[in-house]
């Protein structure tokens, strides 16, 4: 057992440092092509690259380990200190992805067929997950790899609506202007704004505003973007109509949308992950997350789905991303135990 653990940790160190050295912000996933070709050859896992999103699919089978290869922008030089690995994506989500790749390799060596994906664009508009749902893959079970502290099983995510608003007005000299588009729209923003408070209450948050071209002329045009988040028990149309009513004189456009997801705590993936953690004397927690993930998209394929992964979720998107080799090992072990159970029951 100790020998297996050291083998996994050594392989995880090698692969994760290699992958962290490759800068893959969203839409730049092709930078990792040679890495996945090497994995395919070394671990004898068939490689398929989805043509539209440049997502990477390894292996075969009806069980999918799905993580993502893209990261938020901002390269961090990878390093290792005392079995702690630092780098952009160490937590979100190259650490979980490496755990999944190693688990898939070891499972396939045992004759248990499992696929693993390094999906593209999860940090943006999830074009990788969306392309996967359009392919003829038939997955009975999906485990989504995101950092969940190595103990948490995510069974619910909120949905999101990305909304562009374009407003126009007559420009005037600022010294004698009777109206001002910035002032008028700012009042409406304050009226419609819903601060993120708790999971069950929707949030409407302005994230971008642009207007004006000259120091002494009021703006003729204004661009505004809202990031709307809502739980499965909130009414999507009511939120959109509330914003439309407030900005009646402006043009509105939904530029991206992700539905909320909530799965049964009794579905096979949740139950197998729970038992996998208990077998390691780790107390599992069922949690819900305020953001979104590829699970929101992949729920279209199967209801036997949940999210789990190694890594401290508080470090996501920060410049302090780090993960320990022990965390990755627990991730590998959990994925393997869960899939072995799912395989036996299939």
Swiss-Prot record:
Provide the cofactor note recorded for this chain's UniProt entry. Binds 2 Zn(2+) or Co(2+) ions per subunit.
Any GO molecular function:
hydrolase activity, acting on carbon-nitrogen (but not peptide) bonds, in linear amides
Q: Which residues bind Zn(2+) 1?
A: 68, 92, 146
**Residues the record lists as binding Zn(2+) 2:** 92, 123, 317
NCBIfam families the UniProt entry points to:
dapE-lys-deAc, PRK00466.1
Cystine residue pairs: none
> What name has this protein been given in UniProt?
[LysW]-lysine/[LysW]-ornithine hydrolase
User: Per the entry, which co-factors are needed?
Assistant: Zn(2+); Co(2+)
- Swiss-Prot/TrEMBL GO biological process terms: arginine biosynthetic process via ornithine; L-arginine biosynthetic process; lysine biosynthetic process via aminoadipic acid
Q: What is its main location?
A: cytoplasm
Q: Which UniProt keywords apply?
A: Amino-acid biosynthesis, Arginine biosynthesis, Cobalt, Cytoplasm, Hydrolase, Lysine biosynthesis, Metal-binding, Zinc
Catalytic reaction annotation? [amino-group carrier protein]-C-terminal-gamma-(L-lysyl)-L-glutamate + H2O = [amino-group carrier protein]-C-terminal-L-glutamate + L-lysine; [amino-group carrier protein]-C-terminal-gamma-(L-ornithyl)-L-glutamate + H2O = [amino-group carrier protein]-C-terminal-L-glutamate + L-ornithine
The cross-references to Pfam families, in alphabetical order and at most eight, read: M20_dimer (PF07687), Peptidase_M20 (PF01546)
Please tell me the species this chain comes from: Saccharolobus islandicus (strain L.S.2.15 / Lassen #1) (Sulfolobus islandicus)
Q: In which pathway does it act?
A: Amino-acid biosynthesis; L-lysine biosynthesis via AAA pathway; L-lysine from L-alpha-aminoadipate (Thermus route): step 5/5; Amino-acid biosynthesis; L-arginine biosynthesis
The family line of this record is: Belongs to the peptidase M20A family. LysK subfamily.
The gene name reads lysK
Q: Which domain of life is it from?
A: Archaea
Q: Which GO terms describe its cellular component?
A: cytoplasm
Where does the record say this protein resides? Cytoplasm
Enzyme Commission (EC) number: 3.5.1.130, 3.5.1.132
Q: Does the keyword Hydrolase apply?
A: yes
């Amino acid at each position: 057992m100790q020998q297996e653990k050291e083998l996994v940790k050594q392989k995880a160190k090698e692969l994760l440092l290699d992958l962290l050295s490759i800068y893959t912000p969203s839409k730049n996933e092709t930078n990792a092509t040679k890495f996945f070709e090497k994995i395919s050859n070394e671990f004898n896992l068939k490689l398929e690259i989805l043509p539209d999103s440049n997502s990477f699919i390894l292996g075969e089978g009806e069980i999918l380990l799905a993580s993502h290869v893209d990261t938020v922008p901002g390269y961090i030089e990878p390093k290792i200190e005392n079995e702690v690995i630092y780098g952009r994506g160490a937590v979100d989500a190259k650490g979980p992805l490496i755990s999944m790749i190693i688990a898939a390799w070891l499972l396939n060596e045992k004759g248990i067929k499992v696929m693993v994906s390094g999906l593209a664009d999860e940090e943006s508009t999830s074009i990788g997950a969306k392309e996967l749902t359009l392919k003829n893959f038939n997955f009975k079970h999906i485990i989504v790899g995101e950092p969940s502290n190595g103990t948490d099983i995510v069974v619910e995510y909120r949905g999101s609506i990305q909304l562009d608003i374009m407003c126009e007005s007559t420009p005037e000299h600022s010294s004698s202007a009777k109206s001002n588009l910035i002032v008028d729209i700012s009042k409406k923003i304050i009226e419609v704004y819903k601060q993120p408070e708790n999971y069950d209450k929707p949030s409407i948050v302005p994230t971008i505003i642009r207007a004006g071209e000259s120091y002494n002329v009021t703006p003729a045009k204004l661009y505004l973007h809202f990031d709307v988040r809502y739980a499965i028990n909130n009414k999507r149309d009511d939120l959109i109509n509330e914003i439309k009513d407030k900005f009646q004189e402006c043009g509105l456009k939904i530029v991206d949308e992700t539905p909320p997801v909530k799965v049964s705590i009794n579905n096979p993936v949740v139950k197998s992950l729970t038992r996998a953690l208990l077998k390691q004397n780790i107390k599992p927690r069922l949690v819900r997350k305020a953001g979104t993930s590829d699970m929101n998209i992949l729920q279209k394929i199967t209801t036997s789905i949940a999210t789990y992964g190694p890594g401290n979720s508080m470090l996501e998107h920060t410049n302090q991303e780090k993960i320990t080799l022990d965390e990755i090992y627990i991730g590998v072990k959990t994925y393997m135990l869960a899939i072995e159970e799912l395989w036996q029951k299939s």
